[in-house]
């Protein structure tokens, strides 16, 4: 392999969750039932949130309002699919849906569409979204960063999670655009076809480890998105 070719190949070993185990350590907790997994976060926009830091994916048949209504009882979040209408949101909010744990999701949409969507829900119910998710297959494009920057001006009080990226450079790009949380993961989802169709991807555990310092230095949270095939993978992600 020539030096010119070698610059495109990483010599570092990259790991998925299935490549590792957690080494047992001493604990004063006598039962797994005694473990408290709730956390409190204060994002860089000043918004504080408390609950179980697990988010049901915004996939069509997972990120539903019905799922959100069930999971909120355990303070678990749901990124609600972008295909859900504002009217459906309004109906469920009036039935007790808590927007502290249910997050509207958008793609690379027009900024005015997003603000109109959120305002319609707020004006109709008196409840405002606390967190929104911006989700695209490739979070490295300029237009995505521009959308984030525009929204941070238009809706500064709303916490924004955005992605997906898998490298420190991607985390820094989105952090500089103004996000409060970065969604990490490309090609690692159990039903994701991105790696198969495009050849693009990154082993999920290494993505988390490689990006952690950059996220901390930029005061954003990392959200591991994908790669979970067994319940034990949750512990590895944390």
Where are these regions (language model features)?
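Repeat-solenoid scaffold signature
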Residues: 216-238
